[in-house]
Amino acid sequence: MAAAAATAVGPGAGSAGVAGPGGAGPCATVSVFPGARLLTIGDANGEIQRHAEQQALRLEVRAGPDAAGIALYSHEDVCVFKCSVSRETECSRVGRQSFIITLGCNSVLIQFATPHDFCSFYNILKTCRGHTLERSVFSERTEESSAVQYFQFYGYLSQQQNMMQDYVRTGTYQRAILQNHTDFKDKIVLDVGCGSGILSFFAAQAGARKIYAVEASTMAQHAEVLVKSNNLTDRIVVIPGKVEEVSLPEQVDIIISEPMGYMLFNERMLESYLHAKKYLKPSGNMFPTIGDVHLAPFTDEQLYMEQFTKANFWYQPSFHGVDLSALRGAAVDEYFRQPVVDTFDIRILMAKSVKYTVNFLEAKEGDLHRIEIPFKFHMLHSGLVHGLAFWFDVAFIGSIMTVWLSTAPTEPLTHWYQVRCLFQSPLFAKAGDTLSGTCLLIANKRQSYDISIVAQVDQTGSKSSNLLDLKNPFFRYTGTTPSPPPGSHYTSPSENMWNTGSTYNLSSGVAVAGMPTAYDLSSVIAGGSSVGHNNLIPLANTGIVNHTHSRMGSIMSTGIVQGSSGAQGGGGSSSAHYAVNNQFTMGGPAISMASPMSIPTNTMHYGS
């Protein structure tokens, strides 16, 4: 059934028909498609009648919240057809670049100049009609309230700025794309969840011929403004909508995206990233290409007691005369269900991390609905295990080199930080013991995961477990330097301070005996509080690094160190490590940590 009346008008006639109920208002967004052709088909008298406009027309679509107003104009700006298309309108796509609308006993076939024009028109129409004819994969897996909040959040320029100012993130993406320019030169690119469009601009810098930038939030409008102001409208096409619901006019050579959340999987955008492979050519690539989740046991009595102390508020027998103690158990459960988002000194880790890898080129969406990570840790230290720490690395495996982006605690801090999941009952383990178990992540419709962790010390049989809600983390990061664990000093710090000073030229800060050049002991003598130590662990082959002091809560930019002697690679391969500020300083025994995955090609480790 037609939603509104429409009239086809012969050449030279004035406009006819009006937008029906629910039609687009005067403030709606207008999209223009030149070169359209119109064919009217009817059988009012029992015979098929056809009328085709001989000249190309200009089609205008005025998008509204519930319907789209469509009008076609001749070169003389005479309206030859006008109607409103809502969710009740009978309509369908025809072939690769045509669309048919049935109004009463007449049908109107609109042919667009290019398949790209048709896809843009079709995406606008689907958005206006509310997608009620079929539910997309995204809609099936996501609660509406969660989706609304999610896209509203990413529609703010301030949030885009927060991500763009994570210079490790942004700089690594740009370096990965530009250093692998042959993967982009004259290629077709799909940017999934483009946000401000920054990755699309990087692809354009690398020489991409066409970039389709898909964005479901209102940020798409801002991205379109940036595309126009940077004179890239001929190469970057912003497509408003979800990648599960829009249409692309052609297959692409490479997909780029920044789909990672806390613990890699939070927000479930990785599934949209994998869904986009329906547009990827068989020989196509994806940036990022693989993702590694690392987990390791940690000890942190201070964090553990913080959570219990908060819950002890409910242990009061007389709070303004009310006994709250009956809720203390529920409060403990609630606080310990929260994953803790912050950073930490790497020396709290008690074993080498276990790695779980997702190859985005091979993985399917369903693989991320239930993620089971078995682990077996060989304990390097004795003490209480308070939980598991998580971080991730992603690799951009290009034709020229592989670039890594890491959120490891040894690396410069990013807006992903690290995540820790506590046990309600800590486990005691000795050096040489094995801690085994499973971390199970079950996807939920709130665009997140329910986490179940079960761990056991094999030698004693002692076991602990916890259930956590990744959608409701505790943001603990304060911008201050994380403290090393108690008992980390194996010589006198006071003596070391003065002994170290004797090896320095205090006026110039010249390094002696391999100490970092930027360490100025005069700051210690003046008060010591300005010396920034973060994630204190000496790593082999890191080279001399500039150590800068950052403001509280800031995301730091990178320094550069070339030619690490510990570079890996085959014969003739090159390796560059873009090292960072105050992440690597001296102190404490090293803990063996899993390094980024070795790829048999030229590799680069930028800002990570």
UniProtKB/Swiss-Prot annotation:
Residues that hold S-adenosyl-L-methionine according to the record: 160, 169, 193, 215, 244, 272
Tissues showing expression: Ubiquitously expressed. Within the brain, present in proliferating cells from lateral ventricular zone and dentate gyrus (at protein level).
GO biological processes: cell population proliferation; endochondral bone morphogenesis; estrogen receptor signaling pathway; methylation; nuclear receptor-mediated steroid hormone signaling pathway; positive regulation of cell population proliferation; positive regulation of fat cell differentiation; positive regulation of transcription by RNA polymerase II
Region (Transactivation domain): 500-608
EC code(s) of this entry: 2.1.1.319
Pfam family, one: PRMT_C
Catalysis performed (reactions): L-arginyl-[protein] + 2 S-adenosyl-L-methionine = N(omega),N(omega)-dimethyl-L-arginyl-[protein] + 2 S-adenosyl-L-homocysteine + 2 H(+)
Organism lineage string: Eukaryota, Metazoa, Chordata, Craniata, Vertebrata
SUPFAM superfamilies registered for this protein in UniProt: S-adenosyl-L-methionine-dependent methyltransferases
Subcellular location: Nucleus; Cytoplasm; Chromosome
Phenotype for residue 229 to E: Abolishes dimerization
GO cellular component: cytosol; nuclear replication fork; nucleus; protein-containing complex; RNA polymerase II transcription regulator complex
Domain SAM-dependent MTase PRMT-type residues, every copy: 147-454
Protein name: Histone-arginine methyltransferase CARM1
Native species: Mus musculus
Purpose: Methylates (mono- and asymmetric dimethylation) the guanidino nitrogens of arginyl residues in several proteins involved in DNA packaging, transcription regulation, pre-mRNA splicing, and mRNA stability. Recruited to promoters upon gene activation together with histone acetyltransferases from EP300/P300 and p160 families, methylates histone H3 at 'Arg-17' (H3R17me), forming mainly asymmetric dimethylarginine (H3R17me2a), leading to activation of transcription via chromatin remodeling.
Gene Ontology molecular function, alphabetical: histone H3R17 methyltransferase activity; histone H3R2 methyltransferase activity; histone H3R26 methyltransferase activity; histone methyltransferase activity; protein methyltransferase activity; protein-arginine N-methyltransferase activity; protein-arginine omega-N asymmetric methyltransferase activity; transcription cis-regulatory region binding
Modifications the protein undergoes after translation, according to the UniProt entry: Phosphorylation at Ser-217 is strongly increased during mitosis, and decreases rapidly to a very low, basal level after entry into the G1 phase of the cell cycle. Phosphorylation at Ser-217 interferes with S-adenosyl-L-methionine binding and strongly reduces methyltransferase activity. Phosphorylation at Ser-217 may promote cytosolic location. Auto-methylated on Arg-551. Methylation enhances transcription coactivator activity. Methylation is required for its role in the regulation of pre-mRNA alternative splicing.
Region feature Required for nuclear translocation, mapped onto this chain: 347-380
Family designation: Belongs to the class I-like SAM-binding methyltransferase superfamily. Protein arginine N-methyltransferase family.
Disruption phenotype: Neonatal lethality. The lungs of neonates do not inflate and they do not breathe. The same neonate lethality is observed with mutants that produce CARM1 protein without enzyme activity. Embryos are distinctly smaller at 18.5 dpc. They show reduced lipid accumulation in brown adipose tissue and reduced amounts of brown adipose tissue. Thymocyte differentiation is blocked at an early stage. Mutants display complete loss of protein methylation of the CARM1 substrates PABPC1 and EP300/P300.
Keywords for this protein: Chromatin regulator, Chromosome, Cytoplasm, Isopeptide bond, Methylation, Methyltransferase, Nucleus, Phosphoprotein, S-adenosyl-L-methionine, Transcription, Transcription regulation, Transferase, Ubl conjugation
Residue location of crosslink Glycyl lysine isopeptide (Lys-Gly) (interchain with G-Cter in ubiquitin): 228
Documented effect of changing residue 217 to C/T: Loss of S-adenosyl-L-methionine binding. Loss of protein methyltransferase activity
Class of this enzyme: transferase
